[in-house]
């Protein structure tokens, strides 16, 4: 069921991105934002490269955070972290009680993903989680007319659009994700690079 709520200008949002894949353990960084204007906190944890622990690690990171009770939404940069460590967005929503918005710069190539998953003994399980994330929708935020692609759990389309427009103040990517990416790559590589 999609929750419908009033989107306040200073809604607390947690944006999560991963770092570069340098080791078996991959750092994930969460930034807590008030709307798209300012950062209130930073969370970090580690997931297994190509593992299946991303959902569980994110749930624990969020529930153990002092920010947990103030958070209203989780934003993810896609649903695969640390290689092919797939996040079950329905479970993330259910376990945290927080709606989940997935943001992607481009629409995934499911044929390539399906082909890559053949190299995993549990590829079918990962594929089911990917398909379970639901329909991918195209959204234009107003920033240069550049589209982004979204998936969602526990939140309606109108609120997703409001939140993305509120937080996409410097690019088509919402600030919580853009800044999480900068922090994660900066810590891992010594300098931030690439795009969220």
UniProtKB/Swiss-Prot annotation:
It comes from the Archaea. Gene3D superfamilies: archaeoglobus fulgidus dsm 4304 superfamily (3.30.2170.10). It comes from Methanosarcina mazei (strain ATCC BAA-159 / DSM 3647 / Goe1 / Go1 / JCM 11833 / OCM 88). This is UPF0215 protein MM_1007. Belongs to the UPF0215 family. Transmembrane segments: none annotated.
């Amino acid at each position: 069921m999609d929750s419908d709520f009033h989107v306040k200008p200073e809604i607390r949002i947690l944006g999560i991105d991963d770092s570069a894949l340098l080791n078996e353990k991959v750092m994930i960084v969460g930034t807590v934002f008030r709307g798209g204007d300012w950062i209130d906190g930073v969370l970090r944890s580690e997931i297994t490269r190509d593992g299946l622990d991303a959902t569980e690690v994110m749930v624990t990171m969020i529930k153990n955070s002092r920010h947990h009770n103030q958070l209203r939404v989780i934003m993810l940069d896609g649903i695969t972290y640390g290689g092919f460590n797939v996040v079950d967005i329905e479970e993330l929503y259910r376990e945290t009680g927080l709606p989940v918005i997935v943001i992607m710069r481009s629409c995934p190539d499911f044929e390539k993903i399906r082909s890559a998953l053949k190299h995993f003994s549990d590829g079918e399980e990962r594929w089911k989680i990917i398909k379970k994330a639901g329909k991918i929708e195209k959204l234009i935020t107003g920033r240069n007319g550049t589209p982004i692609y979204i998936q969602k759990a526990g939140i309606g389309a109108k609120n997703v659009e409001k939140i993305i427009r509120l937080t996409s103040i410097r690019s088509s990517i919402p600030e919580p994700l853009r800044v999480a990416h900068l922090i994660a790559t900066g810590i891992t590589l010594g300098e931030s690079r690439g795009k969220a």
